[in-house]
């Protein structure tokens, strides 16, 4: 999975897809009551990027619905995963449940259209900190209460704050999640980061019966050297400001026989076995 990073403007969707991304990540900004308002990262952000692009969240979902619906004039077959970077760290922790209800409702109304839409992308809920775990409970409660639990098949969760992997596992156990789990490891592209935690996450992914890391990806990689380093470790995905660079690296002799771009037929909730 090549994940285009911080794709918050509508015009950026095609831009990142044209560069080779098959997944996009966008930031969800909330008001103080936990209502998802806009796609927006804000300052500071990655070096060399404009931090202020934004779109009304519901408009973004309406647009991306077209882009991920087969037969639609805007359809782009390669876009198979949407990663929602939920900026829950900016709101009171007691509003995490309200935020989960709101995001689930907006996906139901504007992306899935309560069963009418044929939009097919998988959804990854990127949660910054384990303290915001009530978001997951609320999201699942909302789908159940509204009678749309079938969409759980399309949704996964991922904690992005580089917290202790055992703490993440405990929180997932608390909310009853033991499948559809990704694990991110990384840092803003302005800095370098070691590989100790990433290596541990990959080790757990490869442990039979471990259900709290089906896929592991590294972010936000901009240097060819760090892309190669992560691929050598065996990551499932790379998040980058430059998807075209990842595409280039994947074509190199060292990696061409080991990796390929994920397609819609690849289940993001299953561990890859060669």
UniProtKB/Swiss-Prot annotation:
Cofactor binding: number and manner: Binds 1 Mg(2+) ion per subunit.
Tissue: Expressed by the venom gland.
GO biological process: killing of cells of another organism; lipid catabolic process
Record: residues binding Mg(2+): 25, 27, 85
Location in or out of the cell: Secreted
Highest taxon of source: Eukaryota
Main location, first listed in the record: secreted
Molecular function per GO: lyase activity; metal ion binding; phosphoric diester hydrolase activity; toxin activity
One cellular component (GO) term of this entry: extracellular region
Membrane-spanning intervals of the chain: none
Keyword Repeat on entry: no
EC number, as in UniProt: 4.6.1.-
Active-site residues (renumbered): 5, 41 (nucleophile)
Known role: Dermonecrotic toxins cleave the phosphodiester linkage between the phosphate and headgroup of certain phospholipids (sphingolipid and lysolipid substrates), forming an alcohol (often choline) and a cyclic phosphate. This toxin acts on sphingomyelin (SM). It may also act on ceramide phosphoethanolamine (CPE), lysophosphatidylcholine (LPC) and lysophosphatidylethanolamine (LPE), but not on lysophosphatidylserine (LPS), and lysophosphatidylglycerol (LPG). It acts by transphosphatidylation, releasing exclusively cyclic phosphate products as second products.
UniProt name for this protein: Dermonecrotic toxin SaSicTox-betaIIB1
Organism whose genome encodes this protein: Sicarius albospinosus (Six-eyed crab spider)
């Amino acid at each position: 999975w090549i994940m285009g990073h911080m794709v918050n403007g509508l015009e950026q969707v095609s831009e990142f897809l044209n560069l080779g991304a098959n997944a996009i990540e966008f930031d969800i900004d909330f008001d103080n009551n936990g209502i998802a308002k806009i796609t927006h990262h804000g300052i500071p952000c990655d070096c060399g990027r404009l931090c202020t692009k934004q779109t009304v969240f519901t408009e973004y979902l309406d647009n991306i619905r077209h882009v991920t619906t087969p037969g639609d004039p805007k359809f782009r077959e390669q876009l198979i995963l949407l990663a929602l970077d939920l900026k829950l760290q900016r709101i009171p922790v007691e509003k995490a449940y309200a935020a989960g209800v709101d995001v689930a409702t907006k996906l139901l109304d504007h992306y899935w259209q309560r069963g009418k839409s044929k939009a097919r992308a998988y959804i990854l809920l990127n949660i910054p900190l384990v303290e915001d775990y009530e978001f997951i409970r609320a999201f699942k409660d909302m789908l159940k209460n509204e009678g749309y639990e079938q969409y759980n098949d399309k949704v996964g969760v991922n904690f992005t704050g580089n917290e202790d992997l055992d703490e993440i596992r405990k929180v997932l156990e608390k909310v009853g999640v033991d499948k559809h789990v990704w694990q991110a490891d990384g840092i803003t592209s302005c800095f370098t980061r070691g590989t100790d935690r990433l290596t541990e996450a990959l080790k757990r992914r490869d442990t039979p019966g471990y259900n709290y890391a089906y896929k592991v990806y590294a972010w936000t990689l901009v240097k060819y050297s760090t892309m190669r380093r992560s691929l050598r470790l065996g990551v499932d995905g790379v998040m980058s400001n430059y998807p075209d660079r990842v595409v280039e690296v994947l074509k190199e002799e060292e990696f061409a026989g080991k990796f390929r771009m994920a397609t819609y037929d690849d289940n993001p909730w299953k561990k890859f076995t060669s």
